[in-house]
Amino acid sequence: MDVGRCFLFLLLPSFFFLPSQTQSTDSFTSVLVSQNGLDFVKNLLVNKAIASIIPLQIPRIEKSMKIPFLGGIDVVVSNLTIYELDVASSYVKLGETGVVIVASGTTCNLSMNWHYSYSTWLPPIEISDQGIASVQVQGMEIGLSLGLKSDEGGLKLSLSECGCHVEDITIELEGGASWFYQGMVNAFKDQIGSSVESTIAKKLTEGVSDLDSFLQSLPKEIPVDDNADLNVTFTSDPILRNSSITFEIDGLFTKGETNQVLKSFFKKSVSLVICPGNSKMLGISVDEAVFNSAAALYYNADFVQWVVDKIPEQSLLNTARWRFIIPQLYKKYPNQDMNLNISLSSPPLVKISEQYVGANVNADLVINVLDANQVIPVACISLMIRGSGALRVMGNNLGGSVSLEDFSMSLKWSNIGNLHLHLLQPIVWTVIQTVFVPYANDHLEKGFPLPIMHGFTLQNAEIICSESEITVCSDVAYLDSSQQPQWL
């Protein structure tokens, strides 16, 4: 991987994404890279860039001249190779339209072969010599400026400026009568310096071009499971400030098979990713609409119905246990087994505030009697369940859990007369606590992927709640290929 490709792989954690076929004009997820994050990326970039270009071959250099009384002289420098490069200092800077990264005070060591020959006309003979040389380049500065623009839901990468400047070169010859030819070979300093500059600049240019092509081949969505993806199209140009860069992403759940984006959600305000003290490298803001789009998708896909036929207190699923609660049920169906059918009547609604993350769930609870091979519905109770949530970051996923706060009931219909709902409350509470909540938590704890670039993982993440959104503030660690999850 060359320098330009390394740069964007490391700098833009949200480059994992490309446009999908449909795009919302609203953004529901924002990714902010702070100055600490930029510095981390810069340091990683420098190390990766050096490793990617070393050894670097420089084109051979030839020089011919004529000297009175000696005749024609030919000097060739070949196998010129940069084998070591050290960066004294570097910085990354954000401009109005792009990113600049500069490495200064750079030194590099090169090896080369030299060959010298000349022919004389008096007497007509040819003299030659050869050897090796060590070259040290000092005071080199390397700069790269990249433009970032939104392009049909993706990001367009362009090279604004690229350069390399060599301040000084020292050449030490070995082999042959090297002491005799040292001065002549020193005349190659300017040419060697120019070749080093142009070769490194060419590598940078090729790298940016390769990466721009590479971005177009990346996946269009992040898969969540077999039924859902995350729409991760960019909704605007990156927002560049003095010490941060922010990417605005659609972020809503989509239906995987049809690539259908749920468009019934609206962002209430412009997201401001705020991490206290800007001490974390990365801030990811997720609007509550993202959670509600997931709820709506799974509701529409009919993944929200449960038949309860086993519970910890199994005797509750027999009419004998209900004879004092609903006498008419026991009278009509004595000692009959039962099951409970729970289905959501509308998508759950998630609400986020500074003090609270919660969800309201509307469900229907149908009481069924099992008579021989028949399932006989006898009553339906409407439930309004209120739960509180706890969020946590697991790897690069945002997951959590829910606990029951309270619930209310109303009778929707009954084939066994009127019901005293207050007598049913302990049973319904038990069912919700032992069946509904654990089922929900089994799915919630898996979470969904946050927009993190391939090869990186969140570290020491914190979650901050604000009005209608949550923000994940985190440092970032880079994983080598042996540590990276296979699905990335």
Curated annotation (Swiss-Prot):
UniProt-annotated glycosylation sites, renumbered to this chain: N79, N109, N231, N242, N341
One Pfam family, short name: LBP_BPI_CETP
Source taxon at top rank: Eukaryota
Keyword Glycoprotein: yes
Gene Ontology MF terms in the entry: lipopolysaccharide binding
InterPro entries, A to Z: Bactericidal_perm-incr_a/b_dom, BPI/LBP, BPI/LBP_pln, Lipid-bd_serum_glycop_C, Lipid-bd_serum_glycop_N
SUPFAM superfamilies per record: Bactericidal permeability-increasing protein, BPI (SSF55394)
CDD domains associated with the record: BPI1, BPI2
One BP term from GO: regulation of gene expression
Signal peptide: 1-24
UniProt xrefs under PANTHER family: LIPID-BINDING SERUM GLYCOPROTEIN C-TERMINAL DOMAIN-CONTAINING PROTEIN, OS06G0309200 PROTEIN
Family: Belongs to the BPI/LBP/Plunc superfamily. BPI/LBP (TC 1.C.40) family.
Name of the molecule in the record: Putative BPI/LBP family protein At1g04970
Organism from which the protein derives: Arabidopsis thaliana (Mouse-ear cress)
